[in-house]
């Protein structure tokens, strides 16, 4: 087990996140979690908190959103003894797929999951991502999973950009936010 110099996951996020104004476009402040995830103690604290959220939402499967949600979701799924479903960016999976477009804080994108080979009907899936901004990514992921017959039981992220009000689009779902945005 790795000890941490931080008292909590929120403390680790507050001290390690790197904020980059103007990236990837003017007016956006990019929340770079690379230093947070690279710190073993901070990573453990974050995964522990995300796992507790997923446990409390009665997850059967963890849904990890492309790309940092893969890192977080895999660690959480492993800790809980669950499977991980990678919700992929458009064009990364062979057909047939469930497909959903959405708007980002700084553009447009689409997500996909396989249409065949999954047994997720009626399963409780907890979606894990790095940042909740506009809510577009999580809403699109939810729509994909519900179209496939799954139940999205809850959401867990490291950071929330409150000014973009993504939480409002997902108000009917339980949400865990590990860290607080300082700006």
Swiss-Prot record:
Keyword annotations of the record: Cytoplasm, Glycosyltransferase, Purine salvage, Transferase
Protein family (similarity comment): Belongs to the purine/pyrimidine phosphoribosyltransferase family.
Entry function: Catalyzes a salvage reaction resulting in the formation of AMP, that is energically less costly than de novo synthesis.
Pathway where it operates: Purine metabolism; AMP biosynthesis via salvage pathway; AMP from adenine: step 1/1
Reaction(s) catalysed by this chain's protein: AMP + diphosphate = 5-phospho-alpha-D-ribose 1-diphosphate + adenine
GO annotation, cellular component aspect: cytoplasm
GO biological process entries: adenine salvage; AMP salvage; purine ribonucleoside salvage
Enzyme Commission number(s) of this protein: 2.4.2.7
Lineage: Bacteria, Bacillati, Actinomycetota, Actinomycetes, Mycobacteriales
Chief localization: cytoplasm
Subcellular location: Cytoplasm
Endpoints of the signal sequence: none
Keyword Glycosyltransferase part of the UniProt annotation: yes
Molecular function terms from GO: adenine binding; adenine phosphoribosyltransferase activity; AMP binding
Entries under Gene3D superfamilies matching the protein: 3.40.50.2020
HAMAP family, alphabetized: Aden_phosphoribosyltr
Subunit description: Homodimer.
Name of this chain's protein: Adenine phosphoribosyltransferase
Top-rank taxon: Bacteria
């Amino acid at each position: 087990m790795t000890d941490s110099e931080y008292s909590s996951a929120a403390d680790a996020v507050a001290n390690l996140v790197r904020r980059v104004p103007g990236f990837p476009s003017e007016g956006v402040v990019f929340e770079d979690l690379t230093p947070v995830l690279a710190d073993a103690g901070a990573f453990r604290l974050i995964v522990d908190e995300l796992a507790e959220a997923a446990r409390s939402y009665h997850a059967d499967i963890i849904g990890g959103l492309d790309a940092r949600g893969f890192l977080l979701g895999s660690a959480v799924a492993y800790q809980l003894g669950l499977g991980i479903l990678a919700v992929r960016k458009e064009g990364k999976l062979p057909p047939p797929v469930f497909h959903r477009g959405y708007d980002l804080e700084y553009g447009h994108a689409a997500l996909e999951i396989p249409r065949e080979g999954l047994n997720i009907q009626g399963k409780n899936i907890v979606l894990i991502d790095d940042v909740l901004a506009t809510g577009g990514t999580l809403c699109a992921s939810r729509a994909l999973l519900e179209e496939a017959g799954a139940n999205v039981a809850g959401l867990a992220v490291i950071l929330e950009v409150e000014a973009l009000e993504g939480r409002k689009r997902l108000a009917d779902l339980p949400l865990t936010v590990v860290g607080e945005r300082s700006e």
